Design a protein with these regions (language model features):
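Intrinsic-disorder/low-complexity, polar/charged segments enriched in Ser/Thr/Lys/Arg/Asp/Glu/Gln
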Residues: 1-5, 60-62
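Compositionally biased, low-structure terminal segments
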Residues: 5-7, 81
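Compact, glycine-rich, soluble single-domain proteins
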Residues: 7-44, 48, 52-57
Length: 85
């Protein structure tokens, strides 16, 4: 299992565009990818679940990746967040 935290920098937070791209990225991997904010957890492969967390600028999220390709998945998701959110 790989886990990391990220503090959202984008002033709009995780809105529709980055949420959609995150879901698309998570679906590339066979590993289970979850996103957590303030104790609420969701499957990162489900757009409405990700949007439902209402992630805003300055909030910290935790990403957990578990499965065969967890290392590469965690690295790519972390890179995406750093570049886009």
């Amino acid at each position: 299992m790989k886990q990391f935290t990220y503090t959202v920098k984008d002033e709009l937070g995780v809105h529709a565009r980055p949420a959609g791209l995150l879901v698309k990225l998570a679906k590339k991997y066979s590993s289970k990818v979850t996103l957590e904010k303030n104790g609420k957890t969701c499957d990162m492969r489900k757009l409405m679940a990700v949007m439902g967390l209402g992630i805003k600028q300055g909030e910290t999220i935790t990403v957990t990746v578990e499965g065969e390709d967890e290392t590469v998945a965690a690295e790519e998701i972390a890179a995406f967040l750093n570049e886009n959110v």
